[in-house]
């Protein structure tokens, strides 16, 4: 027997285009596409479909950050309530909290000073803090003259998550 009789690919290549078309039709009929648990599979093989990155609104982020300041871990009913109130899924809230805890622990491991990990603040981290230029991301707080005490919750990041009533309170500058 010749090799082309055993290989359907060679056989369709050597035969007429009509035979190749028939072969193509056969494979299309045999292919099955299954989407299950976020995975797409052709004939049992395939890769996971990545869900698009969730974009949170500023209101959602404010509520999530505020809740994270209260507690780093949510019980199931708390998570369900928070998700429902923000129009998010419980999974989105769960993943956000996981990511936030991870980021928080990473910052603590780096010495609780987030400026050390910021390349724009590299030289400032080595010297005492001076009231030179405010960090780029702190424009709103510095424009309002709000200053956070250095030993507040989440050192160096508290002003990112301040609630609206905190912005109206003036705090004495700590030197």
Swiss-Prot record:
Q: Name one GO cellular component term.
A: chromatin
UniProt cross-references to SUPFAM superfamilies, sorted A to Z? Homeodomain-like (SSF46689)
Location of region: Disordered? 1-32, 109-131
Q: Which SMART domains does UniProt cross-reference here?
A: HOX (SM00389)
Spans of biased composition, class Polar residues?
Answer: 1-20
Q: Where's DNA bound on this chain?
A: 49-108
- Protein's recorded name: Homeobox protein DLX-6
Whichever gene encodes this chain, its name is DLX6
């Amino acid at each position: 027997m010749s090799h082309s009789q055993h290989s359907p690919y060679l056989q369709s290549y050597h035969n007429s285009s009509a035979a190749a078309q028939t072969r193509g039709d056969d494979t299309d009929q045999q292919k099955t596409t299954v989407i299950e648990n976020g995975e797409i599979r052709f004939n049992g093989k395939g890769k996971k479909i990545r869900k698009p990155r969730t974009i949170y609104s500023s209101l959602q982020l404010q509520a999530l950050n505020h809740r994270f300041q209260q507690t780093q871990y949510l019980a199931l009913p708390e998570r369900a309530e928070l998700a429902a109130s923000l129009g998010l899924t419980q999974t989105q809230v769960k993943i956000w909290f996981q990511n936030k805890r991870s980021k928080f622990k990473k910052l603590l491991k780096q010495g609780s000073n987030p400026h050390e990990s910021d390349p724009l603040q590299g030289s400032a981290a080595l010297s005492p803090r001076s009231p030179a230029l405010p960090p780029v991301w702190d424009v709103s707080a510095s424009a309002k003259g709000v200053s956070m005490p250095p030993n507040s919750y989440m050192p160096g990041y508290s002003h990112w998550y301040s609630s609206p009533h905190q912005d109206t309170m003036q705090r004495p500058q700590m030197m």
